[in-house]
């Protein structure tokens, strides 16, 4: 059996949970579509794919689905995972499960995982070691169910899906201590950062804050009063930790 983790994960949070599950089931291979679309690939029934993507406004980020779209299954078992920043995952897990089914995969289980939110100080450090251990145990249980003949699970959510799946509205800016090393420019999922490493195209930026998280000199960030006010209130509203939710076919 070949095991894969197929992920879109700008700050690495969605990747952690999906990778924990995939690696628990065997020697896993990472298919990271954060910076570019997946190459066309067809998987067999003997393979297993763990999909991982972030929740944006209660939906899977639309760009993640676009980049995962070249992957196709042939009755290939998969686990669908979405990661959200402690507010809610709404219709995202249902949406990702539908997406997988439409492309020939058989979702055997799904999970809504809590991760550190992009904005403010919300669930900092998640997923924790305990979260990842839960992920690994869930993957093993899901695989046992599949081998026992259980198929299909019912993720929560509604059709039609709620509005969402787009980027946020807070565009980072660049401080004067920027060294123009090019890391943020080369690592931007949407190619929104200019050649000068300081200018950011607001029409392309999805507010994933990958540049903010990765800048070695902390020159990227949102420094406006509007953002600071929002982040403080949002962090207070979501301070109580939520638990990961796992869905099996029984």
Model-inferred region functions:
Residues 2-17, 21-169, 224-250:
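FMN-binding flavodoxin-like domain, especially the glycine-rich phosphate-binding loop
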Residues 174, 179, 183-206, 210-227:
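Iron-sulfur cluster-binding cysteine motifs and their immediate structural context
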């Amino acid at each position: 059996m070949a095991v894969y983790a197929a992920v879109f994960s700008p700050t690495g949070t969605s990747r952690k949970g999906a990778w924990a599950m995939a690696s628990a089931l065997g020697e896993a291979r990472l298919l990271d579509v954060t910076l570019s679309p997946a190459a066309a690939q067809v998987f067999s029934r003997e393979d297993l794919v763990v999909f991982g993507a972030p929740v944006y406004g209660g939906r899977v980020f639309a760009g993640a689905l676009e980049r995962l779209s070249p992957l196709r299954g042939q009755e290939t078992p998969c686990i669908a995972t979405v990661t959200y920043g402690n507010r809610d995952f709404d219709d995202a897990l249902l949406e990702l499960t539908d997406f997988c089914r439409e492309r020939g995969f058989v979702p055997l289980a799904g999970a809504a995982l809590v991760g550190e939110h992009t904005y403010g100080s919300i669930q900092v450090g998640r997923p924790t070691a305990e979260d990842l251990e839960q992920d690994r145990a869930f993957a093993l249980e899901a695989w046992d169910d599949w081998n026992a003949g259980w198929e299909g699970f019912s993720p929560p959510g509604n059709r039609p899906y709620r509005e969402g799946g787009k980027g946020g509205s807070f565009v980072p800016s660049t401080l004067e201590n920027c060294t123009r090393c090019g890391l943020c420019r080369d690592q931007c999922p949407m190619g929104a950062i200019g050649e000068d490493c300081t200018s950011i195209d607001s029409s392309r930026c999805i507010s994933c804050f990958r540049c903010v998280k990765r800048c070695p000199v902390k020159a990227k960030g949102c420094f406006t009063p509007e953002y600071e006010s929002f982040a403080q209130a949002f962090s207070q509203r979501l301070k109580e930790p939520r638990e990961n939710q796992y869905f099996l076919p029984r």
